[in-house]
Amino acid sequence: MDKNSLWQRYVPLVRHEALRLQVRLPASVELDDLLQAGGIGLLNAVERYDRLQGTAFTTYAVQRIRGAMLDELRSRDWAPRSVRRNAREVASAMQKVEQRLGRPATEQEVAQNLDIDLTEYRQILLDTNNSQLFSYDEWREEHGESVEPMLEGHEDANPLQHLLEGNLRQRVIEAIEALPEREKMVLTLYYQEELNLKEIGAVLEVGESRVSQLHSQAIKRLRARLNNDS
């Protein structure tokens, strides 16, 4: 098959990968931008593919397409500073509330401390969690491995693994055990069982966005507890 035929045959793969990636990103990320980057990735795959290396073209093309899309996202620093700032503010508020009450803070209590309503609080959880989950899934797709062998320099990709490293491990395990049951289950199903958000939602009988919020809140709660203990 010549290069032009190869390109035409695999163009639909670009859209497939773009749609898969878009669902994990904020609404501000345009599908057209992903398609354009993915198209460049496919073009590179067509130009550089060597069948003598023994890799199927589909496998090689997917790697190039995803890589080009991820490069585009990294170059644009897609997670706005406001998202990072909000994440820090939520973690700080949660720490203060739990320190004062001596128990896990409810969503309403954290929202009240931040002087925002519950809807706005849950949107912050959703936005910040998209960043965390995207980073982890990006790492997992690039390396094709599970959580355990996280490479040095990728500690932000898996927030739970990062917390478990070093001398914090026992404290983190104890903090996880003290989490509200649903938050603990989300972490277990996502990081250990490697279920996606839709599958976890089916287990908990909630929507994907609610799973995302629970994950975000669990990670922030863990960090708040560790800060309280330090």
From Swiss-Prot:
Residues 175-223 are annotated as: Sigma-70 factor domain-4. It is found in: Cytoplasm. Keywords: Cytoplasm, DNA-binding, Sigma factor, Transcription, Transcription regulation. Residues 197-216 bind DNA. InterPro entries: RNA_pol_sigma-70_dom (IPR014284), RNA_pol_sigma70 (IPR000943), RNA_pol_sigma70_r2 (IPR007627), RNA_pol_sigma70_r3 (IPR007624), RNA_pol_sigma70_r4 (IPR007630), RNA_pol_sigma_FliA_WhiG (IPR012845), RNA_pol_sigma_r2 (IPR013325), RNA_pol_sigma_r3/r4-like (IPR013324). Belongs to the sigma-70 factor family. FliA subfamily. This is RNA polymerase sigma factor FliA. The gene is fliA.
